[in-house]
Amino acid sequence: MASTGEPDRKRRHFSSISPSEAAAAVKKQPFFWPSSEDKLDTAVLQFQNLKLSQKLEAQQVECSILEDKLSQIKEKQLPYNSSLKTVHKSWEKLTASVESCSVRVSDSSSGAHRFVNKEDGSSPAVKNDFINRLLETGATESSSSNICSNQMEENGVNTSSQMTQTLYNLVAATEDLRCLKDELYPTVLRTNLGKDLCGQLALSELESEIKSFRGDLDDVLVKFKSLSRELQSHRDADAKVRVDLKRIRGELEDEVVELQQCNGDLSALRAERDATAGAFFPVLSLGNKLATSDRERDKQRDLQDMETVLKELTVLASGRLQQLKNLHEERTKMLGKMSNLQNKSKSVRCISSSQACLSLKDQLEKSKEAVFQYMALLEKLQVEKDSIVWKEREINIKNELGDVSRKTSAVTDSRMASLDSEIQKQLDEKMRIKTRLGNISRERGRKEIFADMKALISSFPEEMSSMRSQLNNYKETAGGIHSLRADVQSLSGVLCRKTKEYEALQLRSADYASQLGDLNATVCDLKNSHEELKLFLDMYKRESTDARDIAEAKEQEYRAWAHVQSLKSSLDEQNLELRVKAANEAEAVSQQMLAAAEAEIADLRQKMDDCKRDVAKHSDILKSKHEEHGTYLSEIQTIGSAYEDIVPQNQQLLLQVTERDDYNIKLFLEGITSRQMQDTLLIDKYIMDKDIQQGSAYASFLSKKSSRIEDQLRFCTDQFQKLAEDKYQKSVSLENLQKKRADIGNGLEQARSRLEESHSKVEQSRLDYGALELELEIERFNRRRIEEEMEIAKKKVSRLRSLIEGSSAIQKLRQELSEFKEILKCKACNDRPKEVVITKCYHLFCNPCVQKLTGTRQKKCPTCSASFGPNDIKPIYI
């Protein structure tokens, strides 16, 4: 803006606007000075506070709504918790029943005899592999381990231990049955050996079938392992999906934060726009109008850009929500597949009803029939086997007799050589121990070290007591010095008192001396007056007198006066004599007192000198004692430091002593051990000698036994009969074993039926648990969707509120702009803008209206009717 006058005229021009219009403008729009553009008006702050309070109330209402929804969801979850508890209880009952069944099976099978075939060593490995696979895949725990509660996680260890125990019991029972079969197989093979080739072929076929059965079982286990791996992969995929969900949620939260920041920027821009709209005075120039229009265009452009970004973000958020829905559906499908796979892998019925298991059962029945056939063949082959065995025994006895003699001689020779080498080693060890003991005995004895240490330790208290006595003496001497100091102080006090008395006596003697001087002066005056009187008398005697009467009268007068004077002088002399006597007596007394005081002062000075000498002596003694005390303290410190140095040395010596003791104890123990070893070696040597004697006796015994072999052959027939009886006993024991086998089979069938029932219950409970988990997961997903929809609705509401607030602000700005335009219009015509100012009253009008007024005679202002001339009209530029 360019005005026509000085600053005072500008101020008048500003004040030319009517006060009502200015008040209305202030009420409608807050006023900002150009120097405080960053400050807000109180009205704007109140308006913002009101908005914030409204937002807070809305957020409180939303929080209360969300809390109600959360309480409703918790109430919905209560029946699920009770159902989960019932499922856990049923699962615990089922595991307890399975464990009891396995314990009964293991107890029933514990009496059976176990025999492991060395040729087929795969059965324990298969058992351990089967149990490890079951435990690795989590067959003993719930199928959804990722979603289970904290209580299931806490009780998982106990349940897993119980299930492992039950599995071990079941596998042990099956292993007992297998061992029994493996025990029966060699007996059958021995009985039927060499009887029939067809039997051998059947046995080989049976063996191959059993091996194929085992291979099928291994294949089943491999399939089970593959299924468990697939299940684990599905679990890993589920975990990955959850991680992706978390990541997507984090991205959504970041985007929400960005949106909130954008909303904050929008609100800040709007506040700046409001501030800039109200920061300038309504009377603006054309350049400012263009600048504000450009700013409004820029802000509108920014708003449009932000709206487009917001739309893109909403589209992206909807796409992410759709992805989340798809992922949730895939996850539910995967959970269903996982539950089906787990049920298939953990159900005994499926395994038992599989084709491989049925074929194995058929093969097992066929093998049982073949076993019974081969039992009959075994009975036939037993007789031939006995004859062959007797012949083999005869040959073996002959061979063994020769081998025994050779082996005994070789064993005795090797044993003798080993014993000689061990004896030599023990002798070397004994010599080494003796040398070590001799070296130890040469070293300084322990008693001498202890005696030195005791003497050193006993000398310390004596030295300390002597030092303490010296310190006590020093303390006593220091106490005597203190008493002497007290005596000196008392004597110095007495001396001061005597000196004060001496000064007082000196003052008195000075007074007496002054009095004596006064008396002497008076005596001198009297003597002078007496001489003057004598002179006067001589003068009067020499004077010449005319008449004799006058002379006589004068003589009488003079005589009388002389008599009076003589009386006076005599009186004065007497008084003076009395006073002189008194003064002399007082002087004598004072002289005596002074002499006594001087004597006392001399005595006190002598005593003081003696005390000073004593003090000097004692101070010298004290200094020497202090020096000695310092030396003693330094010696004590050196002794203390030496004692402190000696203490660690003493500790080191004690440690060395303890180490020596430990070393001596070790040597003693080593000596004991060496003695024990020597004793054991002597005992072994004695035993070896006995063994050698026994070997020689055994050789003689074998030589005798060779002569008795013929006698033993005679008894072979008797032994044959005994063997027949043993055969009968073995057949009886075989029948008993078959009965036990039948009982075990019945118990196993019962255990299998119970196990199938328990597995069916477990499967049913797992299915119910899986369904409940699916429902719970769906409920959680729905809850999350509702929460996300609520957040989206909140964002929409906030966006709509911001749009509504922005539209209301734009309307206000437009109204204010129209008002400013009306203010800038001419008040005379209300059509054209203000272009001219009248400098008399500083009112603004358009140029045509002013020209009309100048054309008339009465040139007066239309607003204030003030007269003006053509020179008072000045143009302005807005």
Curated annotation (Swiss-Prot):
- Chain coiled-coil ranges: 48-76, 200-261, 293-382, 537-624
Subcellular location per UniProt equals: Nucleus
Root EC class: transferase
Sorted alphabetically, which Gene3D superfamilies does this protein's record hold? Zinc/RING finger domain, C3HC4 (zinc finger) (3.30.40.10)
Which parts of the sequence are annotated with region: Disordered? 1-21
Recorded hits in InterPro entries, A to Z, give: E3_ubiquit_lig_Bre1, Znf_RING, Znf_RING/FYVE/PHD, Znf_RING_CS
Query: What is the induction comment?
Result: By infection with fungal pathogens.
Please provide, in alphabetical order, the Gene Ontology terms of the cellular component aspect for this entry: HULC complex; mitochondrion; nucleus
Which superkingdom, per the lineage? Answer: Eukaryota
Phenotype when inactivated? Plants have reduced seed dormancy and several pleiotropic phenotypes, including alterations in leaf color, plant architecture and flower morphology.
> What's its catalytic activity?
S-ubiquitinyl-[E2 ubiquitin-conjugating enzyme]-L-cysteine + [acceptor protein]-L-lysine = [E2 ubiquitin-conjugating enzyme]-L-cysteine + N(6)-ubiquitinyl-[acceptor protein]-L-lysine
- In its UniProt record, which GO terms are filed under biological process? cell division; chromatin organization; defense response to fungus; innate immune response; leaf morphogenesis; positive regulation of cell division; protein monoubiquitination; regulation of G2/M transition of mitotic cell cycle
Q: Which Pfam families match?
A: zf-C3HC4_3
Q: What is its EC number?
A: 2.3.2.27
Pathway assignment: Protein modification; protein ubiquitination
Q: Give the misc comment.
A: HUB1 and HUB2 are involved in the same processes, but are weakly or not redundant.
- Function, please? E3 ubiquitin-protein ligase that monoubiquitinates H2B to form H2BK143ub1. H2BK143ub1 gives a specific tag for epigenetic transcriptional activation and is also prerequisite for H3K4me and maybe H3K79me. It thereby plays a central role in histone code and gene regulation. Forms a ubiquitin ligase complex in cooperation with the E2 enzyme UBC2/RAD6. Required for the regulation of flowering time and defense against necrotrophic fungal pathogens. Involved in the control of seed dormancy and germination.
Q: What does its UniProt record remark on the domains?
A: The RING-type zinc finger domain mediates binding to an E2 ubiquitin-conjugating enzyme.
Family stated for the protein in its record: Belongs to the BRE1 family.
Oligomeric state and interaction partners are given as:
May act as a tetramer consisting of two copies of HUB1 and two copies of HUB2. Interacts with MED21.
- Identification of the protein by name: E3 ubiquitin-protein ligase BRE1-like 1
Species of origin reads: Arabidopsis thaliana
